[in-house]
Amino acid sequence: MKPITVTQLNEYIAKILRSDINLSKIVVIGEISGYRYRAGKHIFFDLIDGNSKISCNIWESYRGYIDEKIIDNGKKVIVIGSVNPYSKNGTYSLNKR
């Protein structure tokens, strides 16, 4: 077996995630944790349940489609989005769509 670099591994995993149609529009229910935003820009939080968490992003261009008053730590929400990898860090997040 030929060794590969970390970059090659992360890019390979990202390619798999991007090509999975089930992850391009997915509905996820969970509780908001770690809510933060950049004034007038993007919203960031973790979506958690009893066992797991996933980072979530709501980009500025999608903020007009949501009621920001309901976004707060501890609130149970449903997020419709896509799973997007960030190969540089070997991470992925749920992005609001």
What are the language-model segments listed below?
Residues M1-R97:
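OB-fold and OB-like single-stranded nucleic-acid-recognition modules
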